[in-house]
Design a protein with these regions (language model features):
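N-terminal alpha/beta PP-like core and its mobile active-site loop of ThDP/TPP-dependent enzymes
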Residues: 1-253, 300, 379-382, 414, ...
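Thiamine diphosphate
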Residues: 16, 25-31, 223-224, 233, ...
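A conditional alpha-helix N-cap/helix-loop micro-motif detector
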Residues: 55-56, 100-107, 170, 284-287, ...
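Flexible, glycine/charged-enriched surface loops at secondary-structure junctions
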Residues: 71-74, 250-264, 450-454
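A short, charged, Gly/Pro-tolerant segment at domain boundaries
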Residues: 75-84, 260-266, 286, 455-465
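Short acidic/His/Gly/Ser-rich catalytic and metal-binding motifs that mark active-site loops
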Residues: 84-88, 157-160, 266-268, 313-316, ...
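Glycine-rich, N-terminal phosphate-binding loop of Rossmann-like dinucleotide-binding domains
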Residues: 124, 190-191, 308, 358, ...
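Active-site diphosphate/adenylate-binding microenvironment
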Residues: 262-340, 345, 351
Length: 468
């Protein structure tokens, strides 16, 4: 699952896999498998090191392949007997990964087309961004009145409050975001491509007359599904480093287009007032209350992780990113990502507050990684949206087989008590009035005691998604 996640998330990853001795192959040996057959459909490349003298070259090539173009996972198989043999060759230096560049012809073309476009739109996402490149494209878009709409699970390339922020595409998106994509006279795809999820299953922007320019280091443009006018082979870093050489005019003519896109984004991300909440069952709290309290109490540069499920729609819609990177999630719908990702994120960014939003079904997948967080001193906040079901799967059942509940109901443990058993701070919340203080105590445990904190929020099954 981790390899497939890295494949669809375009995450550079090198995995070294221990294998049986060469002499034991094809004999149904204990734990024998063929790594090329096993990983071949979801890795960029699979190596099997049968000669120790090739070790340095293979390792250098593996790290290069994992990073170049569209990043992804690379597998290196290590037969047991090879590991015991001596390497006497020359150490191969790292292979430089090219970022690509904008030619003068590219710059002239982009300057002309963006100036002439009445309704240009930047679609941003994908790998190989830096804080500097994210800031640069935001400034460019603000200066030239070009809205930026972000890819599925990539809503941290542009600060939430930037006037260039036009929201995001993918599951749970604002209907007006789809309209924006359809109405754009020119789309500049930077780092990401308009594939399955952002086009609502290959239904948006499918006209062969649609004008789309792609900025991507991936020469194959894997996943791209719309008409292509021009492909500039460059990473987001290479592209944004050339923005100062672009000469784009006509910003005033795009002001209404620009402002409307941002206003719609803000409207969609605004929480309702408590008087507008949908009635929930007794003994439950509203996720709207949770996010309202998080807005008030979290530092602006907080980092967020979430996995797969209905809880992600809440996180994607209402969490507010201000700097890149600040959002970590998965694009392949694999559950169990949120807690391990929070551990890794806190270790990578120890000075920043890390928050994970998890559903109860998703938390049950890998919640035991709290032990790892305690072991390595990685305190973070966990909000468990606990409604006693696999919500996304149940929603599909309601739609297609409304009277057949099958395999989606959960009997949960007391998540707060389990967290305390690990040595973390744990609280149970069953009503809105307890939410703000529970979050305050949890953050105090993180900041003062240095331990993770979990808040188990009991929610109504009928309120598993935000109101449209």
């Amino acid at each position: 699952m981790g390899i497939h996640t890295a494949w669809q998330d375009a995450t550079p990853l090198v995995l070294f896999v221990g294998l049986i001795p060469i002499s034991d192959r094809d004999r149904e040996s204990f734990q024998e498998f063929d790594p090329k057959a096993w990983f071949g459909t979801q890795a960029k490349q699979v190596f099997v090191l049968d000669d120790p003298q090739r070790a340095s070259r293979v390792v250098a090539e593996a790290f290069f392949q994992a990073q170049q173009g569209r990043p992804g996972p690379v597998i290196v198989g290590l037969p047991e007997d090879i590991l015991h043999r001596e390497f006497t060759g020359t150490i191969h230096p790292p292979i430089q990964v090219a970022d690509g560049a904008l030619s003068d012809a590219d710059l002239n073309h982009l300057s002309r087309e963006l100036t002439q476009a009445q309704r240009p739109l930047i679609f941003a996402g994908g790998p190989r961004w830096t804080p500097e490149s994210a800031a640069a494209i935001t400034q460019f878009a603000e200066d030239n009145h070009i809205p930026i709409i972000q890819d599925f699970r990539a809503a941290d390339r542009v600060p939430f409050e930037s006037p260039a922020n036009a929201g995001w595409l993918g599951y749970g998106r604002d209907p007006r975001a789809a309209q924006l994509l359809e109405e754009a006279s020119l789309v500049l795809e930077v780092g990401a491509v308009l594939g399955d999820v952002p086009t609502d299953g290959y239904t948006l922007r499918q006209s062969t007359d649609a004008r789309n320019i792609v900025i991507s280091p991936d020469t194959s443009l894997r996943g791209h599904s719309v008409a292509l006018e021009r492909h500039i082979v460059a990473s987001p870093v290479a592209f944004t480093s050339g923005l100062e050489r672009l000469n784009v005019g006509g910003a005033e003519a795009r002001e209404e287009w620009f402002n409307t896109a941002h206003a719609n984004h803000l409207d969609f991300a605004t929480l309702p007032e408590p008087a507008q909440y949908r009635a929930g069952k007794e003994g439950t709290a509203h996720m709207e209350t949770v996010f309202a309290a998080l807005h008030k109490q979290l530092p602006k540069d907080s980092l967020y992780t979430f996995g797969a499920g209905n809880h992600c729609i809440w996180a994607q819609r209402f969490l507010r990113s201000t700097v890149y990177p600040s959002q970590f999630s998965v694009r392949n719908g694999s559950m169990g990502y949120s807690v391990p990702a929070a551990v890794a994120t806190k270790l990578q960014f120890p000075e920043r507050t890390v928050v994970t939003i998890a559903g109860d079904g998703e938390y049950l997948m890998n919640g035991q990684e709290l032990a790892t967080a305690l072991q390595y001193g990685a305190p973070f906040l966990i909000i468990v949206m606990s409604n006693g079901e696999f919500g996304t799967i149940r929603d599909h059942q309601k739609k297609h087989f409304p009277d057949r509940v099958s395999g989606t109901q959960l009997v949960n443990p007391d998540f707060a008590a389990v967290a305390r058993g690990f040595g973390a701070h744990g609280e149970l919340v069953t009503e809105d009035s307890r939410v703000p203080d529970a979050i305050a105590r949890a953050l105090a445990a993180i900041n003062n005691d240095g331990v993770p904190a979990l808040i188990n929020v009991i929610t109504d099954q009928d309120l598993s998604l935000p109101i449209d």
